[in-house]
Amino acid sequence: MPDIAYVNGRFGPLADAVVSIEDRGFQFGDGVYEVIRTYRGQPFAIEEHLARLERSAQALQLSIGQTRAQWSSLIREGLRLSQFPEAKIYLQIT
C-alpha cells in the first residue's frame, strides 16, 4: 500500500481518501499542517514537528485529536504500511 492516507481514524489508499463537505477546513480553510521527512524509515525531528503542530492548532483553537505519543505511533504505523524508507509525511489537521 505505497501511497496511503490516515483520515478519520483509518489508513487506506490515498486515492480513496475523502473529506466531508461539512469539514470546517474544507468550508472555511481552518487548518494546520506539518511535513515530516524520514530517513532510512525514521521520522526526522518528530517531537519538534509534533510540538509545533500542537502549538499551531492551539493558536487556531483546533484539537489535534491525538496525543503526541499517539501521533508518533500512527506515523510509524503509516511508514510501516507504506514500505517507504524515504518519505515525506504530510499531517493536516482541520
Language model features: what each stretch is:
Residues 1-94:
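Conserved alpha/beta cores of soluble small-molecule-handling proteins
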